[in-house]
């Protein structure tokens, strides 16, 4: 399905999701990863620098995450309620930072791992 939020930094990217609810990273963010976060503030800057895209539960075009995403020229979609519960690590999504859409390309993380 496609979720509609607020487009905050233009561009399109598709890739795997990494859900982050805290700034404490257990492992580095892999290249090409789209991060899904509850909110952003100044502390998220170094993490955003590693991300290919951003989805946030709250915020708009003037929120910190949106401004930083534009600086780093990564697509960002804000205001997707409960995004951190709706997505799973490794799930493939496509985000459009102009239209403000987040499209699920796979329903669950690794479709190929069911044996």
Name every feature range the model reports, one short phrase each.
Residues 1-115:
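Non-catalytic, soluble scaffold/interaction modules
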């Amino acid at each position: 399905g496609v979720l509609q939020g607020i487009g905050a930094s233009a561009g399109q990217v598709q890739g795997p999701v990494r859900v982050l609810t805290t700034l404490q990273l257990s492992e580095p963010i892999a290249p090409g990863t789209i991060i899904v976060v509850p909110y952003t503030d100044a502390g998220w800057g170094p993490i955003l620098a590693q991300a290919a895209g951003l989805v946030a539960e709250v915020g708009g075009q003037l929120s910190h995450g949106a401004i930083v995403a534009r600086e780093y020229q990564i697509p960002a979609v804000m205001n997707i309620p409960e995004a951190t519960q709706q997505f799973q690590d490794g799930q493939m999504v496509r985000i459009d930072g102009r239209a403000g859409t987040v499209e699920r390309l796979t329903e669950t993380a690794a479709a190929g791992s069911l044996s």
